[in-house]
Swiss-Prot record:
Named cofactor requirement(s): Mg(2+); Mn(2+)
Family: Belongs to the mab-21 family.
Record carries keyword Nucleotidyltransferase: yes
Function of the protein: Nucleotidyltransferase that catalyzes the formation of cyclic GMP-AMP (2',3'-cGAMP) from ATP and GTP and plays a key role in innate immunity. Acts as a key sensor of double-stranded RNA (dsRNA), the presence of dsRNA in the cytoplasm being a danger signal that triggers the immune responses. Directly binds dsRNA, activating the nucleotidyltransferase activity, leading to synthesis of 2',3'-cGAMP, a second messenger that binds to and activates Sting, thereby triggering the immune response via activation of the NF-kappa-B transcription factor.
Binding site for ATP: S57, E69, F70, D71, Q241, E242, Q243, E244, K262, S275, Y276, Y277, I278, K279
UniProt-listed Gene3D superfamilies: 1.10.1410.40, 3.30.460.90
Keywords: Antiviral defense, ATP-binding, GTP-binding, Immunity, Innate immunity, Magnesium, Manganese, Metal-binding, Nucleotide-binding, Nucleotidyltransferase, RNA-binding, Transferase
Record-given protein name: Cyclic GMP-AMP synthase-like receptor
Organism, as annotated: Asbolus verrucosus
GO biological process, one term: defense response to virus
Length: 383
């Protein structure tokens, strides 16, 4: 079993260092150039912009397959003088943000140029509105893109590392830049988020910050599942990505295990299990086990975590790492989870009694070549 998993990890679910290096250079150059255009077009964005956070599975080291999609958070700040106040909502994992001293800030010099635009991000009671922020962000991205030279239906973005064709698409809370040239084609999701320091860390049953070197957290304009009579546009999802990245780092077989679990999920067709649910199982495992566990053989780590994962599915509950009141599986039907639990039980049994079935369960086949006694691998499907 160990040799099989090591082969799969090495040949299929790990990205080459050359690909990682190339994509990092191109992506950083494109994003910094485009953000510069956005700052030129909008004084409010220029005032609030802090930095880019390179988020998602690629930068966490958890991506399976070719790196073609990237998640970037544009971190913005709110004027302190306006007294932004975060309060936990009735939905675990979500908060409200209200500007308690907006009128006084509007009289400050810095508000003279941007005050009217800033008020458009709020609702009638001075709560920061996800809907309004998304509309503002969509307009800004299009204005920045429209300033670029055109080539047919696309725009040309010239950066220090080359010129790329860019087109804009909208998807959920993100504005997607589709970037391509003769050698590369990638999608970059840009999401406007707001960043806060440790003085605003949420309480009320939220876990305290376990990573002192990362005091900041974000709020993201992602809507919750909530009754129609609720003010949905006031709900902001909390994000502790920087802390999570530190918690899962420098643990030898942790990231290969996550990739194997994602590969298994995809091949079994369990697409209702979000990658973040798997990451949350891992975060709980980090709490429950010391660092030496992740240095044990990959087969031991993978099978142990797979059994942990099955237990969560059997109990129909994966507690949100940062607030256990939030069950990440609450939106999935009981019958669906029962069927998944039964399937995982059979998978675990087969893997333990017949390790060669791992190839099939992970969607990979291999052929033995007697000529040189080496295995040659071929993916059944690209993830």
């Amino acid at each position: 079993m160990e040799n099989i998993l090591q082969d799969i990890n090495k040949n299929f679910i790990s990205l080459s260092n050359d690909e990682i290096r190339r994509n990092n250079i191109i992506l950083d150059s494109v994003v910094q150039t485009f953000v510069g255009k956005m700052k030129e077009k909008d004084p409010l964005f220029n005032l609030m912009y802090r930095r880019v956070f390179y988020g998602g599975s690629f930068y966490d080291g958890l991506r399976v397959g070719k790196p073609k999609e990237f998640d970037l958070d544009l971190l913005l700040t709110l004027p302190n003088f306006a007294q932004p106040v975060l309060t936990t909502s009735n939905i675990p994992g979500f908060v409200f943000l209200k500007l308690e001293n907006l009128d006084a800030w509007m009289r400050q010099p810095e508000a003279q140029r941007v005050g009217a635009s800033f008020k458009k991000l709020l609702d009638g009671r001075n709560y920061l509105s996800t809907a309004n922020v998304l509309v503002w962000m969509e307009g800004l991205v299009h204005r920045a893109a429209n300033d670029l030279p055109a080539r047919g239906s696309k725009r040309l973005l010239t950066t220090p590392v080359g010129t790329f064709e860019v087109s804009i698409h909208k998807g959920g809370p993100a504005m997607t830049l589709h970037i391509c040239d003769s050698e590369i084609e990638i999608d970059v999701d840009l999401v406007a988020c707001f960043v806060f320091g440790s003085n605003k860390w949420p309480t009320n049953r939220f876990r305290s910050n376990p990573v002192n070197s990362k005091p900041e957290f974000f709020i993201v304009p992602k809507k919750p599942r909530a009754p129609e009579d609720q003010p949905i546009q006031r709900y902001w999802r909390l994000s502790f990505q920087e802390q999570e990245r530190v918690l899962i780092d420098n643990k030898q077989y942790l990231k290969p295990t996550v990739k194997l679990l994602k590969q298994l999920r995809d091949n079994l067709g369990h697409n209702f299990i979000a990658s973040y649910y798997i990451k949350t199982v891992i975060l709980h495992a980090v709490d429950e086990r010391d660092d030496s566990f992740w240095r044990r053989p990959l087969s031991h780590v993978f099978m142990t975590i797979l059994k942990d994962f099955k237990t969560y599915i059997e109990r129909k509950k994966i507690p949100y790492y940062w607030n256990s009141n939030n069950n990440l599986l609450s939106g999935i039907g009981e019958r669906t989870l029962e069927n998944m639990n039964n399937r995982l039980r059979n998978v675990i049994r087969d893997m333990e009694t017949r390790p060669e079935t791992m190839w099939e369960y992970l969607g990979i086949k291999y052929t033995m070549y007697s000529k040189d006694s080496k295995k040659q691998f071929k993916e059944l499907s690209e993830v």
